[in-house]
A protein has these predicted regions:
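Pre-recognition alpha-helix immediately N-terminal to the DNA-recognition helix
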Residues: 10-18, 29
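Short, cationic-aromatic polyanion-contact patches
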Residues: 5-11, 63-82
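Short helix-coil junctions and helix-kink-helix linkers
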Residues: 32-40
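Alpha-helical DNA-recognition elements
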Residues: 47, 51
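Amphipathic alpha-helical dimerization/coiled-coil segments
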Residues: 80-124
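Glycine-centered, phosphate/nucleic-acid-interacting loop/turn motifs that mediate DNA/RNA or nucleotide
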Residues: 56
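Short helix-capping/hinge SLiMs at alpha-helix to coil transitions
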Residues: 19-24, 36-37
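Short acidic, hydrophobic short linear motifs in intrinsically disordered regions
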Residues: 25-33
Length: 126
């Protein structure tokens, strides 16, 4: 598995969330789980699974009669990649400009500010 996590659409995130919760799963198990939350047709969910397999975000176990699907990346790896993409697109790739905007616009309590200071103080300098 390479370090570069492929981009995942919002709909594909829903499929991934099901697989991160419990894997491996058959296509029918993924469909059943998603139909409890989303108003999607089984064909739509199968298409999303196929896309995730093509992107190499989801693997397929073909050792059995039933194919089972499993994530090739952890939820944390995908969240980190998504956050970096967001930072590049919206904030020119710098964490500082995003943090400044959030800090200036948020109502922070003294406790919030102390916690942020503590996190920054514990962070090793580069």
């Amino acid at each position: 598995v390479s370090n570069q996590v492929p981009g995942i659409s919002e709909a594909e995130w829903e499929v991934m969330n099901v697989l991160w919760e419990k894997e491996p799963l058959t296509a029918n198990e993924v469909i059943f789980s998603l139909q409890e939350k989303m108003d999607w047709k089984p064909k739509t969910i199968r298409t999303l699974l196929d896309r995730l397999v093509k992107k190499k975000v989801v693997g397929v176990n073909q050792n059995q009669k039933l194919y089972t699907f499993f994530p090739l990346y952890t939820q944390g790896e995908c969240q980190k990649a998504e956050a970096q993409t967001f930072l590049k697109r919206i904030y020119g790739g710098t964490m500082k400009s995003m943090l400044v905007q959030f800090i200036e616009e948020e109502e922070l309590t003294e406790e919030d500010m102390n916690e942020l200071r503590s996190i920054l103080n514990e962070k090793p300098k580069k």
